[in-house]
Amino acid sequence: MTTLPETKACKVNIENEWLTISFNQPEKRNALTSELTDDIKNIFDAARDDLGVRGVTMRGEGGIFCAGGDLKMFKTGFQGGEQGMKDVEEASALTGAFFDMINSYPKPVVMLAEGAAMAGGLGMLCAGDIVVVTEDCKFALTETTHGCLLYTSDAADEEDSVDLGGRRII
């Protein structure tokens, strides 16, 4: 069996040939921080060819699946004027590639959600092969309130924001 990598933002467990990844940043509402996405990518890479792992379950700790993107990074990086449109497009493309990695994984990926799956958290949830949610789980696509178009490599410019009726743009 492959040795799984050390993680910063996840708990990892293998039991009965099944890998469980638990997002373990409830104080950040299990946001898609760079630490969390790096952990998930590294775990998926390590388990990809491991015959001792037949499938993967992903879930959130602390009563929430995932609140989406890391808004602290978003506000300082993208809305702080330090990065341009190209940087926003690259970040969006990386997010899309992350979802594609989950969706195209060669083993079944089961998503278990409770609490909320918001923005990129909902995108990640939809990338799974099987999705199970609690009856009271909340869902929302809130990217447009931050000037981003949904799961594309684009961000809204001034002209687009007028078309979308937006008030804030990147």
Residue locations for each model-derived region?
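Glycine-rich beta-to-alpha active-site loop
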Residues: 96-147
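Conserved CoA-thioester-binding segment of acyl-CoA-metabolizing enzymes
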Residues: 1-61
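Beta-strand-connecting loop/turn residues
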Residues: 16-17, 63, 137, 167
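Conserved small/polar residues in nucleotide/adenosyl-binding loops
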Residues: 151-160
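Glycine- (often His-adjacent) and acidic-residue-rich active-site loop
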Residues: 60-98, 117
